[in-house]
Amino acid sequence: MGILEKVQPIEVMLPERYQTMSILEMEERVREIKEKMGALLFIPGHHYQKDEVVQFSDAAGDSLQLAQVAANNKEAKYIVFCGVHFMAETADMLTTDDQIVILPDMRAGCSMADMADIEQTERAWKELAKLFGDTMIPLTYVNSTAAIKAFCGRNGGATVTSSNAKQMVSWAFTQKERLVFLPDQHLGRNTAYDLGIPLEKMAVWNPHTDSLEYDGDIEEIQVILWKGHCSVHQNFTVKNIENVRKNHPDMNIIVHPECCYEVVAASDYAGSTKYIIDMIEAAPAGSKWAIGTEMNLVNRIIQQHPDKEIISLNPFMCPCLTMNRIDLPHLLWALENIERGEQINVIRVEKQVTEEAVLALNRMLERV
């Protein structure tokens, strides 16, 4: 079942009046509603959100940080999640039944999460079992649908974040001989390589051809990577790095591990969103940085650190387009509906899916 089938009710079109309101009018109304509702309303905002949204966030962070913060908030009745659908799903699964999770715009999806649907994954697992038998354990990046998390949960696997991927991959190899990593091949490849697994012992499962792509000996394969990627981080290239090295030879290059292996290998540093933020925060004044991650976050880091020279690794970088569907008009629309005693775009994950997905989430949370 897809995300849109799980949500009641669904409204896609923003009412016209929100498109004609001034920014100042909308900002004033959001403040009024936040003040009126107090602790009953909680607004988590992802690092990749626009400033117009982040300014109203009660907490900012990466996807799992925000879901955990939401889960720890027992006062809020309404959690208006300013992120994308898989994040809102995770928040719904980790919060109580009487808490209502709302996504301001149902079109705010994630192309990478959508690259692994449950039918493809079940089919792949059966085919891979013919090759490798009961020697595999699945791990999924938290940037995945609730259904994929549930698949991992019922098959003994777990979720991972970019911050704890090494720890979780290491754990996986204490459970089984082989790892199936969904849905981001780059995070899986970079993590496994950092742990000493050579590239020739990694294969890629292509869900479009239902085939395993590999160069080495099939018996030696330890990591099976799902053929998925982040559309934002895929756009950072080795050529970008070469240009920075040529034009700014004293500049540090730091990238997210969702970038491809070649880019990560050519960079000075690679790590999660939090790692990047903390690294720049701790860097001395006057230091120079080229950052390979989402544009809204890079621009915010630039604004927060005027004492440092910071640029985007790719000067023609675009923001995460689906994340950017959450904007001030949609946020206000969601809040005004709550104010009227109505809810739009409520995220509800089925009970069985929740139970199995929480197994995968808890296997991670109890180890990190």
UniProtKB/Swiss-Prot annotation:
[4Fe-4S] cluster binds at residues 110, 230, 320. Catalyzes the condensation of iminoaspartate with dihydroxyacetone phosphate to form quinolinate. The gene is nadA. InterPro entries: NadA, NadA_sf, Quinolinate_synth_A_type3. Keywords: 4Fe-4S, Cytoplasm, Iron, Iron-sulfur, Metal-binding, Pyridine nucleotide biosynthesis, Transferase. Binds 1 [4Fe-4S] cluster per subunit. This is Quinolinate synthase. Pathway: Cofactor biosynthesis; NAD(+) biosynthesis; quinolinate from iminoaspartate: step 1/1. Its EC number is 2.5.1.72.
